[in-house]
Amino acid sequence: MRLEVFCEDRLGLTRELLDLLVLRSIDLRGIEIDPIGRIYLNFAELEFTDFSSLMAEIRRISGVTDVRTVPWMPSEREHLALSALLEALPEPVLSLDMKSKVEMANPASCQLFAQSQERMRHHTAAQLINGFNFQRWLDGNPQSSHNEHVVINGQNFLMEITPVHLQNENDEYVLTGAVVMLRSTIRMGQQLQNLSTQDLSAFSQIIAVSAKMKHVVEQARKLAMLSAPLLITGDTGTGKDLFAYACHQASPRSAKPYLALNCASIPEDAVESELFGHAPEGKKGFFEQANGGSVLLDEIGEMSPRMQAKLLRFLNDGTFRRVGEDHEIHVDVRVICATQKNLVELVQKGLFREDLYYRLNVLTLNLPPLRDCPQDIMPLTELFVARFADEQGVPRPKLSADLSTVLTRYGWPGNVRQLKNAIYRALTQLEGYELRPQDILLPDYDAATVAVGEDAMEGSLDDITSRFERSVLTQLYRSYPSTRKLAKRLGVSHTAIANKLREYGLSQKKGEE
């Protein structure tokens, strides 16, 4: 029988409660005291009349506000919850003490080693896992999880060993043991395969924290539902292909094929057969294969004038002929085009058909460069760090406090792709458990030079001025890393600079200014 006593924080109250149990000759099996004003009692079953009388007497104790029966003591509830969790885990889990002896093993581990719970407690980790040296791991003063490949009963496992630190009476955290989890590589492969075949809710894979990216994603969600051609523009590495695929996945065509062709990577004479098919070889083209779905034509600005004419005809009525065949084929395909070039300039230079441009420019999605979305940089960094650490089977490193300042100040001419590659390169060569600015190699970047690129003259005068102003501040802030120094350099007030830095998302934490 277990009771939960609600009470005030009064000196001597617990003593009076225990005296009452002694007076009634009740065998107390356990007592637990909660700091928030609850006392839990565990004792043998009582007759109903004795129990009712005891409850009444407890309520008469000064400071007791209520009393009720409960099914478990707090420690019992925690133990049962932990046991249920361990039993539900499909992966074998072991709890080890400081001598590598098994203290606890879940059912999956008992099944793997063909041992009962009791017999498991008579083994050390080294006896169960061939080649595992617990002492060597211990001598390394472990502070975080460690992964290594092990073979058990002919099966391959990724073993993750995590140190367990508990707080002692001096408020110091001391190492008390470890938890070992064994992940079957076959099971992991199946899970990844299943994950890759699922419809990962279209835009859930796109990081959008900044207002600009949120607006683009919201716009893309609306455009995804339409069937008219979609033109996606943006600098290199901004994620045009990712948005194209997301638009397909979010559209009514998601159950149908999605195919992508890079117009710049295929010779001109091969593009036609790739898109429309080749009759002599019995080959179906992209448009025919993707009937009912979507086709991405990446780097559309690189398409030859002859192919531009054929594409325009297809966009007008959805019909085409395979190479070497006169028979017309009609398909229903949504065409998504992507380019990092300024198509208006190409039209003016006679390199891109004006009528095709207007046919493609019905629905347009313009992706901003990463330098214009500084709020997205750290969320993207955290995503890439987690992804690549997991892929490489290494612990996820901590991000140093000053990493954010360095990454958000950099101009990222290669945009998200450059950030992704920089993080990957840093993790492959990282020593230690912290990712610092010096671990990420970034080429020199002149923000002012980029500011006069193809997109610099788009929009109103205010838009153009803002882009140039942000570029100047981005470049100079690296050399004058405080608002006061930068204000002095530019000959304006500290307040004006602070406001501008906040406006463009370039400001550091207050304590760093």
Swiss-Prot record:
Native source organism of the sequence: Salmonella typhimurium (strain LT2 / SGSC1412 / ATCC 700720)
Name of the featured protein: HTH-type transcriptional regulatory protein TyrR
Superkingdom of origin organism: Bacteria
GO molecular function: ATP binding; ATP hydrolysis activity; cis-regulatory region sequence-specific DNA binding; DNA-binding transcription activator activity
DNA-binding region(s), residue ranges: 482-502
GO biological process: catabolic process; positive regulation of DNA-templated transcription
GO cellular component terms attached to this protein's record: cytoplasm; protein-DNA complex
Chain's role: Dual transcriptional regulator of the TyrR regulon, which includes a number of genes coding for proteins involved in the biosynthesis or transport of the three aromatic amino acids, phenylalanine, tyrosine and tryptophan. These three aromatic amino acids act as effectors which bind to the TyrR protein to form an active regulatory protein. Acts by binding specifically to TyrR boxes in the promoter region of the target genes.
This protein's encoding gene: tyrR
